[in-house]
Amino acid sequence: MKILVTGAKGFVGKNLCAALNNIKDGKDKTRPSLVIDEVYEYDLDSTLVELDSWCKDCDFVFNLAGVNRPKDNSEFMKGNFGFASTLLDTLKKYKNTCPVMLSSSQQASLTGRFGNSEYGRSKKAGEDLFLDYQSKTGAKVLVYRFPNLFGKWCRPNYNSAVATFCNNIANDLPIQVNDPSVELELLYIDDLVAEMLDALEEKEHHCEFEGLEVVAGPLGKYCYCPITHKATLGEIVDLIHQFAEQPKTLLIPEIPNGSFAKKLYSTYLSYLPKEKAIFDLKMNVDQRGSFTELVHTLNCGQVSINISKPGITKGQHWHNTKWEQFIVVSGHGLIQLRKEGTDEVLNYEVSGDKIQSVIMLPGYTHNIINLSETEDLVTVMYCNEVFDSSKPDTFFDPVEKD
């Protein structure tokens, strides 16, 4: 399959082309039914000769080219309708009736706040042109009215509030929110790309529109991405501020799989300047070694790393409800446990040469001993709760009694 992508250097185009090329080059094997031979990437620096050749040769077209923020409103029609005419005329020239996807916008509904949108009018004109092309040629046309888009590589201070918020907060720049209660419908770039790949496999999702509302149905003349999220401007900004504090608090917010928060967090991180991609952690250092907290979570505890100097014993305490897992990743050590009120000592010899996890059982006093005379003992420690100095649940008691 040979695929033509117009607007290939735009936000959607870059992400889609990356996905298509990963499949073409065998780096992405999750869609075995897709065999991609060529990805033709058309943009402003391409020539009409190239467009002509690619329109003759292609098996599928993603038309993402368009104008979002022109200097003059008249450029909307030229950029969003004019190029579409050129594209379709070139396909007709070669009698190439391959499927064509059109990137449109919710604003093409021309309803509500979009009633007087010049951008919306140009997009609606493009839709009508493509649908007319479909009726006259029999070519399959997929018209997608996208809501607000967000994700990596989206240009800030252009036409995405999320991109602007992420960029500005990541770079310590001011943001402006006039009404935090305004709700947006948001489509994540990976979900959009997944739908485009579905379309290549003839698994696109069809619908009609009642105003801005999607009415799903297999006979709908439009198409849509089934996974979107709704959030207010205030909620979006609050989440991004939480993400920005993570290097200080170590707290990873709840980001369930598929959630808006997870997608927004990844988006925010893509705007971090290089100096913020590295940050210091607080090492608690003494003559025995060091203890450093790495990550805190809201409901699943924390992860730390412990370094013990040669011959050092750490621990010698027990917990009621708290429990831990010790994973030695470097060095040679001994982990000991003893159930409170008993004399039997459990001994677990551990080494970075064989990674194992030892559970510090509730009600068992425990320690960890560096058996080496020359090397540090490095241990990753998981605890089921974040340490709370007001409720430490930690009680001193040596494992081995004198």
Give the ranges of each region predicted by the language model.
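A conserved pocket-lining segment of Rossmann-fold NAD(P)-dependent short-chain dehydrogenase/reductase
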Residues: 147, 164-187, 199, 207, ...
